[in-house]
Structures are given as C-alpha cells and as structure tokens.
Amino acid sequence: MAMTAAVKDEISRLPVTRTCCRKAEVSAILRFAGGLHLVSGRIVIEAELDTAMAARRLKRDILEIFGHSSELIVMAPGGLRRGSRYVVRVVAGGDQLARQTGLVDGRGRPIRGLPPQVVSGATCDAEAAWRGAFLAHGSLTEPGRSSSLEVTCPGPEAALALVGAARRLSIAAKAREVRGVDRVVVRDGDAIGALLTRLGAHESVLAWEERRMRREVRATANRLANFDDANLRRSARAAVAAGARVQRALEILADEVPEHLAAAGRLRMEHKQASLEELGALADPPLTKDAVAGRIRRLLAMADKRAQDLGIPGTESNLTEEMADNLAG
C-alpha cells in the first residue's frame, strides 16, 4: 500500500473520544475537502474524499456529534479520476451544521481560514485539525531526497492556519503556492515522523522510518562504493605511471642501481596495476607496503638525480600525456 493510502487508512480507524477533537477534525475535513453551496436559498455542505473509510468516519461523526444525517455518494473512476471518490452531502440542516463547525461566522459569512474554536483550541485540536486536513487533501511521498508531507489547501488563509497549527505542535511547516494552488509542506524527515505520530499514525511512522533508514543505508553504501571505486581507479593509474617511471629509472642507472631497489622496481614493472600491499606480498622475502613504497621512491629519486647530473631526461619523461593528466587529476 502506498504511504499516503496507508496513513489515511490508519488515521481513519483511529478512535478519538474527546468531543472537542472530533469537532475539530470534522471542521477541518469540511474546510479542506468540502464546499458550501446555496440551493434554493439553503446551504448544502459537501465533502469529497478519496477513501471510503474516511467518508464513513465523517458521515458517522456528523451524525453522532452534530446530530445531522448525510448521504454518501460513490463516484466511480472516470475521466481524470483514477480511483473512486466519496462525497458526503448534508442537505437538511446544512445551515446549522455550517455554523456548528465554524464554516460560517455569526452573520453567515464563510470562514476563509480554520474556525476560531480550532485556531484557539488545545494542542489536541491542532492535531485533530491536521488529521482532518490530511484525510481531506493530504499526501506523503516515499522517503528520499524529495520526500514531503503535503496538504492541498482551499486558499492562502487556510494554509496559514494549518502552518500555525503545526507550529503549536512544534513542527516546521511552510505554506507555498504552486501554479495557483496553495499547499502546506513539511519536508524534514524528522518533522514528518513527528507529525505522523501526532496524527496517530503509529504504524505508518514505523514503516516510514524503516524505509527512510533503508534508503539512507543504501545511499551510504552507494557513496562508499563510488568512493572505493574512485580510489581503486586512482591507485591503479598511479601504479601504471610508477611502472613507467621505474622503467626509465632502470635505464638511467643501468648497473649502478642497488639490487634491493632494482628488485622493488622490477616487481612494479611486472605487476603494473598491483597495489603496494600486493607487491610487498610478492617480494622475497615479503615486505610491508611502506617498505616497497620507500624503495621505489628512492630508486626514482636516485635516477632523477643521475639524469640531472648527466643532462638527460628524467623518469617523468617516460610518462604518456594521459598518465600525466591522470596523476594531475
């Protein structure tokens, strides 16, 4: 199940006993998923949701808390709709429900943000408002570089009210307008986990954190693999270049080269891409990689000094242009 659907399924099943929280959740759902329509001079309230569980929860709460019956209409997939949509409609008593939920003020004017009783309510009301907003128009993407928890809002005032509710929960959320649509976004992974916990989506938090950890482990492993590959490539290029310089060093020094340095040089030439550690293991008797590196370094230095004294090209003259570029990079 996708993360968004999993969260909505879980919080739709969450038992909430406090009346103030149930009221705040219903108010938020109607504000973010609903609309007020005037039909024959009366207010009709509709809320369109994308899960049957959330729609049934809303229908039940409207009846149990506010005493109004509603009808549930299922809209089959079609056109731009990929899945079924569920519309909860209140016709009889719509005017009264609009006032009870704070969708309109005392004069019957629509509230553009969140109802005052939700904005000024307790922390549990802020949690309930977020729960309702997420059920209405929320989404959660998989953990990753662009992971986010978002709620599409009916307007900038509602977005700012939701940001304020998040602030009361000590969660950083930002209001954004994208192509004329107002959204509230939480991007930080820890903040997303904290908000899901506040919503009561405890199973989803565990799944989110597990996927997040798996991705981080995978990303770290990839970085280390890339790092190791790059190091191996650099080491191999350096070894090939060292072999070319050693070949020139032995030509310059000829019979004047000490045997232990010549032996290290011959190992380098015979095993051009071997690591220093591998060369040490091939030596007789075996040497440490530092001992091999030291002997090759002294061989090259001796040859370069001899070349300078003779006025002839040194060991680096044996490097191709590509070798020189690789060493410089």
Swiss-Prot record:
Provide this UniProt record's keywords sorted from A to Z: Cell cycle, Cell division, DNA-binding
GO terms in the biological process aspect are:
cell division; regulation of sporulation
Keyword Signal in record: no
Recorded GO molecular functions are: DNA binding
Signal peptide, first to last residue: none
Q: Which residues bind DNA?
A: 275-308
Question: Which PANTHER family has this protein been placed in?
Answer: CELL DIVISION PROTEIN WHIA-RELATED
> What exactly does this protein do?
Involved in cell division and chromosome segregation.
Homology family:
Belongs to the WhiA family.
By what name is this protein known? Answer: Probable cell division protein WhiA
The organism's taxonomy opens as:
Bacteria, Bacillati, Actinomycetota, Actinomycetes, Kitasatosporales
